[in-house]
């Protein structure tokens, strides 16, 4: 009888271990940006030197806000993000804010989701996260440009 009890305990512990194995394994680049995200926060969206991009993916529910602060020479001097989503979305936001800092508006506009996906080594099922980051950058740049046009018009 004790042999049956011991075997049953062993089987249960092995089943628990199998059930706790993660379904998806993330590359260390994703894990690093997820566990230690860079540039989390917000900038003052009323500031004319700040562009704000807010994008979402209805299919998965990810929402990403990315903001840039641009100096008088057209150089991005700061970037912040807030993302509600999976680890890949957070990592994509974090990497995107790192990459746009120090770039001109034109250079930042050339950043592609494929660059983000390649750096993070995102699997095909997570490519939409890097697309969201690209869309958020483009939306932030567009918002900044609209503010600048309004400033010149006044």
Swiss-Prot record:
Belongs to the NifU family. Pathway: Cofactor biosynthesis; iron-sulfur cluster biosynthesis. GO terms for cellular component: cytoplasm; mitochondrial [2Fe-2S] assembly complex; mitochondrial matrix. This is Iron-sulfur cluster assembly enzyme IscU. NCBIfam families: iscU (TIGR01999). PANTHER family: IRON-SULFUR CLUSTER ASSEMBLY ENZYME NIFU HOMOLOG (PTHR10093). Scaffold protein for the de novo synthesis of iron-sulfur (Fe-S) clusters within mitochondria, which is required for maturation of both mitochondrial and cytoplasmic [2Fe-2S] and [4Fe-4S] proteins. Component of the mitochondrial core iron-sulfur cluster (ISC) assembly complex; regulates its activity. Component of the mitochondrial core iron-sulfur cluster (ISC) assembly complex at least composed of the cystein desulfurase Nfs1, the scaffold protein IscU, the accessory protein bcn92/Isd11/Lyrm4, and probably fh/frataxin. Interacts with Nfs1. One of its GO terms (molecular function) is iron-sulfur cluster chaperone activity. Keywords: 2Fe-2S, Iron, Iron-sulfur, Metal-binding. InterPro entries: ISCU (IPR011339), NIF_FeS_clus_asmbl_NifU_N (IPR002871). CDD domains: IscU_like. The lineage of its organism: Eukaryota, Metazoa, Ecdysozoa, Arthropoda, Hexapoda. GO terms for biological process: [2Fe-2S] cluster assembly; intracellular iron ion homeostasis; positive regulation of mitochondrial electron transport, NADH to ubiquinone. Fe(2+) binding protein that acts as a scaffold for the assembly of iron-sulfur clusters. Binds 1 [2Fe-2S] cluster per subunit. Its cofactor is Fe(2+); [2Fe-2S] cluster.
